[in-house]
Amino acid sequence: MAAAIMAAEQEAAKGGGGRNRGGVQRVEGKLRASVEKGDYYEAHQMYRTLFFRYMSQGKHAEARELMYSGALLFFSHNQQNSAADLSMLVLESLEKSDAKVAEDLLENLAKLFSLMDPNSPERVAFVSRALKWSSGGSGKLGHPKLHQLLAITLWKEQNYSESRYHFLHSTDGEGCANMLVEYSSSRGYRSEVDMFVAQAVLQFLCLKNKTSASVVFTTYTQKHPSIEKGPPFVQPLLNFIWFLLLAVDGGKLTVFTVLCEQYQPSLKRDPMYNEYLDRIGQLFFGVPPKQTSSYGGLLGNLLNSLMGTGEDDDTEEGQEDSSPIELD
């Protein structure tokens, strides 16, 4: 098999354009036949050999396509380790090439992620590198489209907390709301239906994503079976969030201040709410930052990781301001 593969690979190295692609297809055919016979180890090693040969020849696209098809093939035969290894090589081909971030490439990466064992360490390493590459070297937290695709996969796996994190770094407020409705209905207490969306809205606003904050609130309150039609709402916290979104659009500090004072009983339900609101006051109402946080320890660390450090508050709204931020 190795001799046949190498002969096909040498043919692929000749010429250009369609002829090159024809050679790659012949290589794929030989490798597929080997995998179908169950020669997994030999096929895996040959994929790796061809990858490094293509890369050394500057054939980054061919290397990427071959590794992607190989990874899918190994996944289809439940060869998780080999598939994960080739998935990492797909990323390596992207990292070492001048390939631009494009939707089809993001979809390919999300597809590989969806096929990996959810509990494997390789998946954690893969998503970290994929997000870093998708940021285009900007130092941001990854492309919002990739975050959206990852969020959808994690939602299907009922990994709601991780799905929520990625939705918050996407621009898909509607998808986030639909996931939160399911999350709240299946895992939450009826008394906390308002808290699921309140946290999401406040964190979207801390990320300067007003549009998604508004969409997630409207969609969630319309679709959640335990929330009566509003506004106004039965739950005071939902009324606060509704007024807050209106106040953010208006930008009047006095309105924001009175609003926070009037709804303190509701805001005390979660000690992080006032910390988020301190940040929102800085971003949208010109409130100067506090010299020291009122919280230390775990809460202080959580808030600092949410807000990032040293970020520029004057950047554009939404994903244009995705400075290093972690959300629990």
From Swiss-Prot:
Pfam annotation, one family: GET4
Biased composition (Acidic residues): 310-320
Domain of life: Eukaryota
GO annotation (BP), single: post-translational protein targeting to endoplasmic reticulum membrane
Gene3D superfamilies listed in its UniProt record: Tetratricopeptide repeat domain
Region (Disordered) location: 306-328
GO molecular-function term, one example from the UniProt record: protein-folding chaperone binding
Compartmental location: Cytoplasm, Cytosol
Keywords assigned by UniProt, alphabetized: Cytoplasm, Transport
Subunit text: Component of the BAG6/BAT3 complex.
PANTHER family: GOLGI TO ER TRAFFIC PROTEIN 4 HOMOLOG
Function, as annotated: As part of a cytosolic protein quality control complex, the BAG6/BAT3 complex, maintains misfolded and hydrophobic patches-containing proteins in a soluble state and participates in their proper delivery to the endoplasmic reticulum or alternatively can promote their sorting to the proteasome where they undergo degradation. The BAG6/BAT3 complex is involved in the post-translational delivery of tail-anchored/type II transmembrane proteins to the endoplasmic reticulum membrane.
Record's protein name: Golgi to ER traffic protein 4 homolog
Lineage summary: Eukaryota, Metazoa, Chordata, Craniata, Vertebrata
